[in-house]
């Protein structure tokens, strides 16, 4: 085989490697820091929560997301080693509980890491960095939705209230960036289930959350129960 043939083969192999790598990697534009209101989560499931919910917004997950096209998911099948997060498990159980089954927090964290966190590279380096990042955001950076609303005198009283009041309170703590809401109807009343705070792809500054498409559960009415 001549030099020309060797160059052709090397070029084809290199092109194939690039194609495989690019097809197996989905990038992301921004992050959603999603927090769920425990009582509404329990009301949304056909099987009741095993333990009474706290009247708090706690972490659902930190999700790398795209403005257009599919969001990246399941970028690894490697489960979380509980020993690697042993020193932060006490904090995680408080801010990131498995609301549906408090006997299996690790299972919930593992699902969030595999489905979402593993796709956050380079902003998220590994599983321990993923969980520590969430702790920093929720506690140190005070991206705790319950705390944000409480500072604005909006307490979880289980009453109907204007969604715009909730949005304005959150905007005041996120450099006036638009949050994302998810609602559900329960016994004819629309409950606020989730709030998402959006950040850029490097997790360094807030950004507006994209407007949800028509028919999305992320479209909430003017008044919601909280």
UniProtKB/Swiss-Prot annotation:
Active site (record annotation): 60, 112, 116
Family: Belongs to the RNase T2 family.
EC numbers on record: 4.6.1.19
Keyword Glycoprotein: yes
Protein name (database record): Ribonuclease S-7
Task of the protein: Self-incompatibility (SI) is the inherited ability of a flowering plant to prevent self-fertilization by discriminating between self and non-self pollen during pollination. In many species, self-incompatibility is controlled by the single, multiallelic locus S.
Annotated source species: Pyrus pyrifolia
Catalytic activity: a ribonucleotidyl-ribonucleotide-RNA + H2O = a 3'-end 3'-phospho-ribonucleotide-RNA + a 5'-end dephospho-ribonucleoside-RNA + H(+)
Entries under PROSITE patterns matching the protein: RNASE_T2_1
Glycosylation, residue list: 74, 77, 126, 144, 172
Pfam families, per database record: Ribonuclease_T2
């Amino acid at each position: 085989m001549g030099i020309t043939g060797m160059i052709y083969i090397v070029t084809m192999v290199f092109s194939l490697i690039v194609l495989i790598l690019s097809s197996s990697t989905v990038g992301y534009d921004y992050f959603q820091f999603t927090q769920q209101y425990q009582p509404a989560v329990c009301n949304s499931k056909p099987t009741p929560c095993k333990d009474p919910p706290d009247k708090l917004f706690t972490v659902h997950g930190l999700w790398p997301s795209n403005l257009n096209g599919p969001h990246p998911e399941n970028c690894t099948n490697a489960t979380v080693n509980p020993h690697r997060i042993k020193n932060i498990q006490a904090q995680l159980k408080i801010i990131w509980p498995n609301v549906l089954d408090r006997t299996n927090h690790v299972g919930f964290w593992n699902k969030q890491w595999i489905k979402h966190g593993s796709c956050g590279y380079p902003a998220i380096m590994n599983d321990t960095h993923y969980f520590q990042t969430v702790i920093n955001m929720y506690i140190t950076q005070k991206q705790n939705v319950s705390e944000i609303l409480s500072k604005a005198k909006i307490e979880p009283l289980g009453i109907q209230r204007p969604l715009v009041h909730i949005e304005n309170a959150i905007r005041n703590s996120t450099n006036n960036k638009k949050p994302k809401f998810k609602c559900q109807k329960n016994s004819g009343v629309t409950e606020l289930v989730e709030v998402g705070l959006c950040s850029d792809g490097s997790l360094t500054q807030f950004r507006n959350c994209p407007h949800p498409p028509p028919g999305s559960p992320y479209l909430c009415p003017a008044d919601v129960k909280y």
